[in-house]
């Protein structure tokens, strides 16, 4: 997960944020925890980190939930964003430098859409609502990020917010850039008519306007690989005339509960706020999520939480001792494992080994317990 240059240089990361229509669940927490670890690793290496995260504060799911609950969509978004930030702070997930709502970036979106229309990479679908679409074949490299074949792309496009059956499109995979205004929907003025942004172009516009080209990392959950991240990169590459939006594309695995992926549609969410409300310490939640590798799909359970709580207790007992075994090697190994694809299971195992030695055999290094606690805090974000 190294950045492009040495200590003191800038390291840049854009991570897709939430659509704020419901509370933060453990799937969200696991994703943002993964990028928090990268953030912390870069800071430890001495980089000046420019981390940007968006919030999709105008989108169909948000508008539908607001209509269902009889609440203004802006009030709903503001409420859920506030709760999300509260949960992230409780989990000690460092805030990005820039936290940007889609509604704050309308002018940037309009500028990108204008450029794509001018170059022929976008077109207007004739009809009652003149929506603007991006041509999936506008860049030769389209598809490199996901590596999916066309059949897989079409299936995921339909499942994840795309509209392959939309009449008038040149290609079923062409993605919405600008949704022309409909009655009862929020809209903004533009040279090509009132409307609102498509999902993917929001992120391209925010990333380019806040960071620019050549990101070190574009990141998010693995369910965003296609179509969202593929099209976000394609939009940016098309406008900038570049082959690659980011040096690395990083995706966190999904969190399941009771044998199924955790999702709003399934109704099996484990909410961070609910766990906190039950008195579960956020540090234990964090450790439970760190017990699995960030890229793998994994399951949350009461056993995972119990094991994390016990681990936290042992670590705190060991680091409260007046002395312990030398800490140099264990801290070096934690850094080494995190630098190797964020291998948190090995990092936690190394700390477990030091903890066992400290509790079972003691030690003579009076600085060691404090050094271990400081390293765990800085590198893993767990306060002991």
UniProtKB/Swiss-Prot annotation:
One of the GO biological process terms: cysteinyl-tRNA aminoacylation
Uppermost EC category: ligase
EC number, as in UniProt: 6.3.1.13
Any one GO molecular function term: cysteine-tRNA ligase activity
Pfam families recorded: tRNA-synt_1e (PF01406)
Catalytic activity: 1D-myo-inositol 2-amino-2-deoxy-alpha-D-glucopyranoside + L-cysteine + ATP = 1D-myo-inositol 2-(L-cysteinylamino)-2-deoxy-alpha-D-glucopyranoside + AMP + diphosphate + H(+)
Family: Belongs to the class-I aminoacyl-tRNA synthetase family. MshC subfamily.
Entry function: Catalyzes the ATP-dependent condensation of GlcN-Ins and L-cysteine to form L-Cys-GlcN-Ins.
PANTHER family tied to this protein: CYSTEINE--TRNA LIGASE, CYTOPLASMIC (PTHR10890:SF3), CYSTEINYL-TRNA SYNTHETASE (PTHR10890)
Protein name: L-cysteine:1D-myo-inositol 2-amino-2-deoxy-alpha-D-glucopyranoside ligase
Gene, per the UniProt record: mshC
